[in-house]
Amino acid sequence: MSIFDVLTASAEMMPSHYKDMSTGEMEKRVAAIKRAFGKRLFIPGHHYQKDEVIQFADTAGDSLQLAQVAEKNKEAEYIVFCGVHFMAETADMLTDDNQTVILPDMRAGCSMADMADIQQTDKAWQELQELYGNTIIPLTYVNSTAEIKAFVGRHGGATVTSSNARSVLKWAFKQKERILFLPDQHLGRNTAYDLGIPLTEMAVWDPVQNRLLTDHPENIKVILWKGHCSVHEKFTAENISQLRQRDSGIRIIVHPECSREVVSLSDDSGSTKYIIDTIEQAEPGSKWAIGTEMNLVQRLIHSHPDKQIESLNPDMCPCLTMNRIDLPHLLWSLEQLEKGEPKGVIKVPEAVRTEALRALNRMLSHT
């Protein structure tokens, strides 16, 4: 489902009166429904969710953690996924047929995932096969549609997360000489660089021009799809320069969805879980600037008052589509379950699911 499809989805919209309810009343109702359903209901929440939502999550995590939890949970009849569309798709594919996955707001998409559609990817693969022959293995960030995961699974590849990208890339290079990395060029570039692959052996594939942007294709080992995260691309070298001038003692940690320039100028980089763990283990009184989604940064600020924490970009805003999952939508979704009329059910077609699972399972077996 593209971001346009998500934003214009014909799925039933939440009645407007939910927006008029007090926070206290909504929280009381959500808590009551959770108690009534017990283990029949499971609510996973991504770290980028608002506090008003994450307080009701049965588990909070990054994309890898939530994928693993979804796969292991066999008790819940309903999984109300507080994340974005591709995450709910992944949960549906990893859970059993008797489990129903629900997204509280079907408009909660991901612009990065939509930067690689299946038609463009098929065309790119044909061109790359003509150029390189059978020397390429595709990998896709889990921030991708089920169809892209299925494409990767069909061609012997695997999914990756920011937590395990390094280990999966190592595995992939044992399979083939070259990698096609979808859809986030920055995570692909940063991970490959950390493995010792020079930038001169990487090139961007432009899906609009349908060509590889290099004058020396024979040197290329990593083909990077021209996609990015609209949140993490807003962190810049200028942000870092201004911060260093203001406070030379501050440490900067960023997510690898940031550009290569930003990552190279930072003190550290890693997955959402890595960032959280690093801050938790940091010395009291230490100073940190964090380059990732604002809801998580604010949560870290509030939960670690003994440390000085700020956003690397003071003008950063939260992820727009992730924030479509709010307390009113969560309550509406749960009340529909209570009525026996679930809305926002996510169901990946079986043919797509079978091939996408190959890619997901290859990842999970190397994690």
Curated annotation (Swiss-Prot):
Gene Ontology molecular function: any one: metal ion binding
Residues reported in the UniProt entry to bind iminosuccinate: H46, S63, Y141, V142, N143, S162, H255, P256, E257, T272
Pathway: Cofactor biosynthesis; NAD(+) biosynthesis; quinolinate from iminoaspartate: step 1/1
HAMAP family found in the cross-reference section: NadA_type3
PANTHER family: QUINOLINATE SYNTHASE, CHLOROPLASTIC (PTHR30573:SF0), QUINOLINATE SYNTHETASE A (PTHR30573)
Role summary: Catalyzes the condensation of iminoaspartate with dihydroxyacetone phosphate to form quinolinate.
Protein name: Quinolinate synthase
